[in-house]
C-alpha cells in the first residue's frame, strides 16, 4: 500500500455524535447478544443519548478503554470441533462499527478485484461465479490454501504498520491497537491478546482484508488468477506441476512475510471438481453444491428430526423450513436442482421414519397404514418383514401412506423446481454416495 490518506482529522470525525449514532443503528440492525457487561441493545437504546455522549467524551479525552470480549463457542458443521467467536460489549461494538464506517471507504478502492469477502456489493456467489469463469478459461487445477487459525495469528504490529501506510492520523491506529489488545474473558479470567483479532467484532472482517490484501497484491504481481473470500483462497493454474510449484512458493510467502501459518494437511492441489470453495465446486464447467456441504445438510436434517419425542408434522416442517429456505437460497447458485431434490427427499424420509416410530406396536402401525389407504396385504407384508424403522420409511407402503404431495400440503418448502439443464445429471458429484 502507498499513497497516504490526506486526512489528518479522522479521529475528530469518528467522535462526532452522528458517526456514533449511525454506528449504533447498524449494531441494532445486526442484533447480537450482550458482551461481558450483560448490557443488551434494548438497555443501551433506553439511555442512548447518555451512552453516546459518554462514549464521545471518553474518546476525546482518551479515557475510552475497550472491554475484553466474551468468548462463545459455535459448533462447526458436521461436528468438526468449534469456532471461537468474541462478542464485544454494546458500547465497544458501536465504536468498532463507527471505525469501520470511517475506514472502509478509505481502503476499499485499493483492495483487489479478486477479493470478495465482507466487502460492499460483493457476495459469496460473486466469488464462486468468478472461480467458475477462471476454470472455464482453461485453468482447471486449483491451489487450495488453508490458513491455520488465521484470525488468531494476525500479527498486531504488522497490521498496524500496514494501516499506517495509508492513514496519517496516528490516533486512529492507536485506537485500533487498543481494540486488538482488549483481551478475552474466559471463565471469568481475562486473557490478554498478544496476537489475532477475535471473530465476531464488527471491525474484524475489514482488518482481515487489510492483512490479506498483501497476499492479493503478491499474487497479482506474479500474474496468478485467484479468488479469495476472507481467509478462503483458491489459485487457478493450467497444470498439476504449476499448481505444486505455486503451492510451495505462496506458502513460503504467507509464512515468511505475513507471519501466518499454512495448514499443510488441509491445503491441497487438485482439479476443480475435487475442491470445495464456499460450499460449492466447479464440475465440468458448471457449479454444483460440494459433497461435504450436502452431507452437512443431511446431518442438519437429522438434528432437526430427533427421536424420542412426539412429533407434530406441521410444527416439525415449520422448524425445518426455517433452516432449509435459507440454506437453499444460498445454494440456489447450483446448476443441479437434483441436489436440492435429494435434500427434500431426505427430509421426507426422516419424517416418515419418525411417523413410523411414533406407532407403539406393529399392530398400531398396520392400523395407521390401512387407515391411510394402504391395502391390508401390502401393509402386513411390509410391517411384519422385520425391517427397522429407517428401512420401513423407504417402503412402498409407507410412501403410499405419506406421499410427497401430503408433505407439500402440510407445508414442506419445495425449492427443487425442474428448470435447469442439468436436472438429469447423475454424476457422483451431484448425488451423495
Residue ranges of predicted features:
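Core structural elements
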Residues: 15-18, 66-72, 76-78, 180, ...
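Phosphate/adenylate-binding "loop-and-lid" substructures adjacent to NTP/NAD/dNTP-binding pockets
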Residues: 38-77, 82
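Conserved polymerase palm-domain catalytic core
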Residues: 58-73, 110-274
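Duplex nucleic acid-engaging cores and interfaces of nucleic-acid transaction enzymes
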Residues: 90-98, 132, 160
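A conserved non-catalytic segment of reverse transcriptases
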Residues: 181, 252-327
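Non-catalytic, peripheral interaction segments enriched in hydrophobic/basic residues
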Residues: 316-362, 369-370
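Extended C-terminal regions of large enzymes
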Residues: 355-433
